[in-house]
A protein has these predicted regions:
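Surface-exposed binding/hinge segments that line
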Residues: 108, 116, 153-198, 221
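Long beta-strand-rich cores associated with HINT superfamily self-processing modules
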Residues: 521-550
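Periplasmic-binding protein-like
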Residues: 310-351, 402-403, 503-513
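N-terminal lobe/hinge region of extracytoplasmic solute-binding protein
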Residues: 58-110, 141, 212
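Gly/Pro-rich hinge or "lid" segments in bacterial periplasmic/extracellular proteins
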Residues: 186-240, 247
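Structural transition elements
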Residues: 338-380, 397-401
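Extracytoplasmic/peripheral linker and loop segments enriched in polar/acidic and small residues
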Residues: 50, 419-422, 426-427, 457-525, ...
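Ligand-site clamp/hinge motif
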Residues: 235-281
Length: 550
């Protein structure tokens, strides 16, 4: 999902001039890694398996305290990092970016507009009651009809959801849709207890009420401002998950220094997304281990306004190629970011992996600035277009400010009229979602991840009319996208995805290929086993944790 905030909270720089110096010094043709870079190490899917039982651990969620743990309203790092261990989905997305059956043992597509799900008969909620088809139907319908559900838009093509047997649920669509089924591996397919939600209504997910789900860890106590506690559920159905940690306290520290100190001292046993500023200390410490894994994460710029200079394709292309993406990835993101060939990153290639990998290889870039080429491209742009001011808005945080300054330096170098606007991080999401706030802003910073490892999910959110993250209203691939979503043949669908990516790349619209990020996880010396790959937003990652014997 699009996130207005970096996955690592960073302290805003007090003096912008200091950031200018850092960016211009760091963004160079030199090595992209640094001594602190986890990205220089080989990526791994899982950390070494644990062997011992652990009574309790403390795990920090880096974006602070969630507003709710209601899975229907959870679509960001913090709530999902907690909820993924409590509430499960019909299908599951695994740490190697695959989608498989989960609470549904199987699914079938008997005709182009029908999906049938066979349910497990050994699943219970934390109160011991069995999960039934009625619970599944209620949960899917709630996602479809409740206006507060973040995932409601994914049900726009659904006409009915019905129980068609004791352990069977059937979903009927208005038209063929070969993306919908995969979406049930996100909280679009979450299953909660019907009677619990009917009893508590909109209080579900609040500190006093919590949730009632089927996952490996059950809700315990929410101490507002401090922590959320969960405990191992003894009746959990999936015996393949070791679940060697009995109790987990999720804390809400957001200050870089406090998080780093807590990790080094052992007060915090682990975290995803450790502070970039603390990576050097963490990597050099014997208090634990820093691991890196693949991630469907991109840091980039999205075109928000086609009425100004960014409406010209050559201006877009010139600016993108003038930016020192390699330098930004090495310096600003401590080597965790590498230049991306396409708007969609490899971890999301999914069913189109072979075709997209081939195409990405044909347009791969080293990420170094191509200043002379950019200037030549701009030479053919009408003067009145080239002179229009281009505005970029970024949130007031260290990494994003430095990124913005790197972009401005590139724009200045090739003669564009460029303005960088830094706004409070707490209000930045308004620029992403509110047209009135955004106004005539030309470019916006984004860190993006899709709900599932499927390129159609990425493109649907970012490059199709009505997409949550298509602020400019770009419509250039709408017809191809509709055709792809309705195409059953995987090979034909894959080729349509490549055609869309080609068009987006050729037009440099509506997102720039920016940086693809890795995922980092810090595990203190007492624990191991967590996935290193970015899968903690919908997968029960904590069930893999175990003790090291230390």
């Amino acid at each position: 999902m699009p996130s207005p905030r970096p996955r690592r909270r960073a302290t805003a720089l007090p003096v912008v001039a200091a950031a200018v110096t850092l960016v211009l010094a760091g963004c160079s043709a030199g090595p992209s890694g640094t001594g602190a870079s986890g990205a220089s190490d080989a990526l791994t899917t899982f950390t070494p398996a644990g062997s011992g039982s652990v009574d309790s651990i403390t795990w920090n969620v880096f974006q602070g305290e969630p507003q709710t743990i209601d899975p229907f309203q959870s679509a960001d790092y913090t709530p999902n990092m907690i909820n993924s261990n409590m509430c499960e989905t019909l299908l599951a997305q695994t740490p190697d970016f695959r989608i498989k059956p989960n609470l549904a043992t199987s699914y079938s597509n008997p005709d182009p507009t029908t999906w049938v799900y066979r349910l497990r008969d050994d699943v219970t909620f934390w109160d011991g009651s069995p999960m039934t088809a009625d619970d599944v139907v209620w949960s899917l319908r709630h996602n479809m009809t409740d206006k507060s559900s973040f995932y409601r838009y994914l049900y726009a093509n659904v006409t009915s959801i019905a129980k068609t047997g004791a352990g069977e649920v059937t979903v009927r669509l208005k038209k063929p849709d070969y993306l919908f089924n995969d979406q049930l591996a996100s909280f679009a397919g979450v299953v909660v207890q019907k009677k619990f939600y009917e009893r508590h209504g909109n209080k579900a997910g609040t500190p006093d009420v919590g949730v009632m789900c089927t996952g490996p860890y059950k809700f315990g106590k929410w101490k507002q401002g401090q922590s959320i506690g969960v405990s191992r559920y003894g009746g959990y159905w999936n015996k393949s998950l070791p679940r060697r940690v009995k109790n987990i306290d999720f804390t809400f520290l957001t200050d870089d220094s406090a998080i780093t100190s807590g990790l080094l001292s052992g007060q915090i046993d682990g975290t995803y997304g450790p502070p970039t500023a603390g990576l050097a200390q963490l990597k050099a410490s014997s208090a634990g281990q820093l691991y890196s894994g693949a991630a469907p994460l991109a840091v980039t710029l999205t075109v928000a306004n086609h009425k100004g200079a960014m409406g010209n394709a050559d201006v877009r292309k010139a600016l993108q190629m003038a930016i020192d993406w390699k330098g930004i990835g090495g310096q600003v993101y401590a080597g965790e970011g590498t230049p991306a060939a396409l708007q969609t990153v490899p971890a999301v290639y999914g069913f189109a992996k072979e075709d997209l990998t081939s195409y990405a290889g044909s347009v791969r870039t080293d990420g170094l600035p191509k200043t002379d080429e950019a200037k030549k491209l701009l030479a053919g742009v009408p003067a009145d277009v080239k002179s229009k001011q281009i505005s970029l808005v970024v949130p007031q945080q260290a990494e994003t400010q430095q990124l913005g300054l790197g972009v401005k330096a590139a724009a200045d170098e090739i003669g564009l009229n460029f303005e960088l606007e830094v706004v409070p991080a707490t209000g930045y999401s308004n620029y992403l979602y509110d047209p009135a706030t955004r106004g005539d802003t030309d470019l916006l910073y984004t860190q993006f991840w899709p709900s599932i490892p499927n390129p159609l999910a990425w493109l649907g959110d970012t490059a199709v009319s009505g997409g949550t993250f298509n602020q400019s209203g770009y419509s250039g691939i709408d017809e191809l996208y509709a055709q792809a979503v309705g195409t059953k043949d995987v090979s034909a669908r894959s080729q349509l995805v490549v055609r869309m990516e080609q068009k987006l790349h050729d037009e440099m619209n509506p997102m720039f290929p920016g940086l693809q990020l890795t995922n980092e996880v810090w595990l203190g010396s007492r624990i191991t086993g967590a996935p290193a790959a970015f899968d903690y937003v919908y997968y029960p990652w904590a069930a893999h944790l175990g003790g090291t014997g230390k």
